[in-house]
Every structure is written in structure tokens, then in C-alpha cells.
């Protein structure tokens, strides 16, 4: 089937298109409505019904006989260790932590901040919240106390789950002093904190407020999945606001799972049992979507990498990870490849490894300059696919839909709109510009399932930040142009 056919099918019957995609994930009860547009300009997909993200990402694969399949490959260049976690083991760890949280009073709708490094326990913490219907808000590990405090106050976090430290090349970053300072700065005080003690640095715990992860989990019962409505928030992810107050992007559970599941097969062309590696951090949107929820909901294996593209120990680290784990597709930011290119311009480190498993390299997160794209393409001898999206969208908006049709790659362009997004380039007055004229990239409402329905406790700010400039459109804040091919 061609891209144009799929895109036209969506455009002619968007509700039918997404209703079909919703059947690919498991609902305890089907949604009451595919799209609720009764409160325009606020739109909600898959309202009512009953669903659980953790069930879809973990339990259902076990029930389908895939429990021994590997869910996560943890590869730490910092600790020089590799750990493979099956779906079965992941479920046990998640259900135990969820039981510990439940035992301490965490329930559906409560907010839990996660402040952790790139270790499997970060994923376990996210899924444990999802299992209970609690709303997680992951804050990048090591982020400043003042920023963490603002987030504690904004979401009224009932609990915080933290790691004792993060690891950077040549140094250990203690997280606990940053966490203690943030709680002292915050007006709202969480009920309790759970601290995962890493061997590299153990944190001092405050009696009565802080609890050791292993102690709590060892005494906990396994908790079952709690059904939530399709439009309920799975998480809040804060983006840095230009005005100082960060914006809490809400991610609705039903739409997010449906669209992520669709992208793994149709966009990234990665399938159950294959190994996908998003070289990002769970603190960013790429980590939420493509280290955790998309690979797991689709039953693929996700690489969780703790390290850097260079210096841990050298510019061959990415090639080692791909070779060791048979990665079929790598998704990273152009910055990572620029760093590798600077350190090893001739690609000598590549000669030490076999990358026969690698089919595609996907780039996003910033502009991919032609130099970097061409260098990577010449070195790896595989397609290098730029794509464009935002924290707000949760998944790709413009890209080359590799799993549907492999379109010609135009270096410097992320390619075509993805089903779910009707995208125009507008002038200052909101008129659609002809081809090859630079203007504001704007997206017709409603946005695709999984994109933000609003900002946390800030509907007015959502409207003023995104919807006020071009009525009927979402303003992306980015500039661009469309060529004659769209």
C-alpha cells in the first residue's frame, strides 16, 4: 500500500482510521467515543472505555506466550555491564514496585515524580505508576533543585522516586542532595520518597520520609493493573517555557498507545522480537515514547543505554552496542553523530564491529544538517531518515513512512506529513503559502491521538501558547516551507 493511499484513507475517514488502529491494543472496555469534540478547541480521543498502559506494554505479551522474550537490554558503558530483562521479569519488578506504592497510599490520578538516571529501575518506576493509574512526571536526573521544586509544586506530587546518583564520564552526580534541596524549596511537600541505592554512591535517607527501594519492594505484594479511561493522563512531561514557568504537557493514555503502536510498524518499520534503540534519555520525550512505551506496547526489544556517543570509552561505543545486541534501527539526535564524526572523522572505530543487523538510522530532535546526514549515510551504507516532531505531539508528525512506503530521501527535508496531522505553512495572517515560501508550520485541529489535549491545570495557557495565533490550527512555533511534492 502506498503512503498517499494510507494518508488519504485517514483524511477521508479519520475516525474510522483511528478506530481500526485502536483494535491493535487491548481495552478492558472499548472507548465510548473515538473523538469527543464537544468542548472545542479541546479535543479528546478514545474517551470512556477502560484501558491500562502497563497491561498493554507488559502483561498482554506474557498472556500471548511471549513472557521469555527480552523487553529491555540495559547496556551501561558507565558500569561496563549488560542486563537483559524479559517481559516476565519486567512484570514481576513492576508489579512489586506498584504494590509498594499502593501500600503507601498511591492511587489512580495521584502524581508521582521520577528523578532517575538511565537504569532499568527508571522504566520500572514509570510502568509501576501506569499500572496503578497514577500519573508520572519524569524529571531529567540531575536537573537543578529549583527546576525540580517548580515541578513538585505544579503537579502537587504525592511521592518522588529517585536514584541515589547518576554517572557521567569521570564523575558521580549525587541526586539526593538535589532532591532534598528541591523539597525544601517547594511549597508542596510530597508524602514520601523512594530511593534506589546504586552501588556507586549510596544516599543518606531521612527517617520517616525516605524509603529504600529494595526494602519496600521485598515486603510488597504484587499489584494488579487498574483500568483508566482512554482520555486519562498517562503522564505529565514538562517542557521549558520561555516565560520561566514550565509547561506541563499532558499525555492521554489511549491515544498515546494507539499512535505509538502504529508508528513502530508503519513509520520505523520495526516489528515484534526485533531490537530497537532510541539513544536518548527517559527524561526527554524521545525516551518516554521510544525507549519505553512504543517498543514495549508493540512487543519489541528496547535498548536502554547509559553512556555517551564518545568518551565512554571512545567513538566506537554506538557501533559496539549495535553489534552486540543486533539492533535493527537506531534513533538518535544529530548532535550524537556530530560528536562521533568530530572524534573519528574517518570512521575507523567502525572497522572493529559488524553492523549487519542495522537497517536504518533515524534522526530527530534538532535540524539534521546535510553534512552529518551524508557522513552517516556514507559510513553506515544504510538509509538515514530525518523526521520532525515535538514533546507536544508525542510521536512523529513529518517523516518518511518507512514501514508503509520508502519514499525518496531529500536531504534537508524530514519528508511528508504522517496520518493524523494535516500540516500547512502559513503567513502572518494565517493564509496558506504557496510552495517554497518560508512561513509558520501549523497543524489543523484536531491533532492526532496521543498529542497533548491541553497543559496540566493550564487550559488558558494552552490556548494562548498554541491555538490563538491561527484559529483552527495548532501553532508549532517552527518555521519551514513545503516544496512542490508536499
Regions found by a protein language model. Name each.
Residues 1-85, 89-92, 96-99, 183-189, ...:
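N-lobe entry segment of adenylate-forming
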Residues 68-70, 193-196, 206-238, 245, ...:
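Conserved pre-ATP/AMP-binding loop-to-beta segment of ANL
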Residues 127, 131-215, 326, 333-334:
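Structural core segment of the AMP-binding/adenylate-forming
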Residues 257-275, 285-329, 342-349:
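Conserved AMP-binding/adenylation subdomain of ANL enzymes
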Residues 300, 328-332, 341-408, 422:
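Gly/Ser/Thr-rich phosphate-binding loop
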Residues 424-445, 482-485:
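Conserved beta-loop-beta connector loops within the AMP-binding
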